[in-house]
Amino acid sequence: MREWLEAVRGDIESAVPNDAVQERPSGSYAESAPVCHVVAGANGCGKTTFALHFLPRYAACLEFVNPDLIAGGLSPFDPARGAVKAGRLVLERVRELSDARRDFGFETTLSGRGYLTWLGGLKNRGYRIHLYYVWVPGVSILTARIHQRVTAGGHFVPDADVIRRRERSIRLMKEYAALADKLRVFDNSGPAPILVYEKNGDAVIHDAKRFEQVNREVGL
């Protein structure tokens, strides 16, 4: 679990598409295999809001392990104080869920390779990996959202960190996509996320114009 802890330390940081469908795969093996749902994207892209709406309603996943939400519960007026303990609780909860072979989800910026080994280990234990990449073009929308979040009492992420993590996330996305059993890419630059691309065996482009933008950066 060391890879998980290292990744969590690096990651302590709307709406749902109308055409979303149940994410549980079909087939005898797929129906019995537990699923790890990875909600990924840069700081400020809207991962938490997306996950809270999408996972329970459309992926039938009721376990969302989020260190920020845990830290906020431990110390609501100063979540940073609860961050270290939240990291430990995340580790414990993930261990419990994976040992019980239950579906669960978590969010990450994917700005490091730490999850590759850990997710590969889950796959070796029979888990399926579903990756939802929440993409936003450029940095200005991300930083504006983060500053707006701070005024509402949310946590701050320095602009330099946002830029650095976004660049690394985009650079590493293909490696994580290769590990995923199912991939979905959403454009979340507007008021609601738009499904752009998905791959579950066959690749399907749902929005050609947006896919061209995403593909220029990510190289799907």
Where are these regions (language model features)?
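Phosphate-binding P-loop
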Residues: 27-34, 97-98
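NTP-dependent small-molecule kinase module
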Residues: 176-220
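A glycine- and Lys/Arg-enriched "phosphate-lid" helix/loop adjacent to the NTP-binding pocket
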Residues: 127-175
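Glycine-rich phosphate-binding loop used to anchor ATP phosphates in small-molecule kinases
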Residues: 85-136, 169, 184
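Conserved lysine of the Walker
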Residues: 47
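The Walker A (P-loop) glycine that initiates the GxxxxGKT/S ATP-binding motif of P-loop NTPases
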Residues: 38-41
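Walker A (P-loop) phosphate-binding loop of P-loop NTPases
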Residues: 44
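Conserved substrate/cofactor phosphate-moiety recognition/catalytic segment
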Residues: 51-102
